[in-house]
């Protein structure tokens, strides 16, 4: 006996939904992992039965960090392998590295171009949707990543499935043929969401463009809830440092550049504020890389506490303690300011980080953004975001997540 309703449900269940996510996860980097975790947790609530594919450049480490966040998540690097291969200028043959996105779009959506990755291509071709998670990884800093976006657009174009991009930071904007490839691809997306005004202006006229801020807002409430408990009598002079060593070549202060300049600036700031070493906490946003400046500071940090990335990831970012932050990294600024902490945002690379940090002050962060590293900023006491500003940012991102992935039980 055939029961039409049951038969329809059985047929629907037999065609399992595949949600295909693309993200720079697994390096690891606090912000990138926070964003991936936030979306996986949302999907665990909204689409618990779906197969979720996270295509990222370091799937092994990403799997170790994120495999518990959704019951059916799998990790691969299909598109990231293709993007890296096509952009490689050391090859004597193969795709044209000056237009790598052309080959990647073809290889990702048709069999034969990348036979070793056929299993991954098969999964990508069967995806029910494709989604570039937020971050600042498709821009002039990493131009070859435009291939990821073009591949997603090609899937949408050839199969009709929706393509989404959320919380994108496109500044510094790609130029020339790379810029054209990006805007042409963006036009194929059902939703193309950006995190800052400059990125929105760069896509002026592209249908489907919206602006709801950084994707980390989707996970801020969890990040604040996971923060280590505050001591009953925290230090009133505490300072937390999160200082990168990558992308610092353009930083200039006191007649020096790069890491030397950043080290001198931080030392001078700590001295001006009269912060003793034992009042300082050092945070790793990227493991290893964020210990370079603290190591250079040497005895100036005598007695300081260091929180390695592993502890940050498993035990939470130590925010809400009343410390004043000095951070070059963007997502520690976002989370600490969301907790109400005061801070100074230092811009290590102006064409990239200025837009990022100022996207937060534009929506209410009261942090000081350093414009002139030769001038030591006064220690701020104004706090970060107000509760209403934080809640507004969280609500906007949650609303977008609900629109893209409404709750479904089958």
Model-derived features: positions:
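Active-site anion-handling motifs in enzyme catalytic cores
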Residues: 1-410
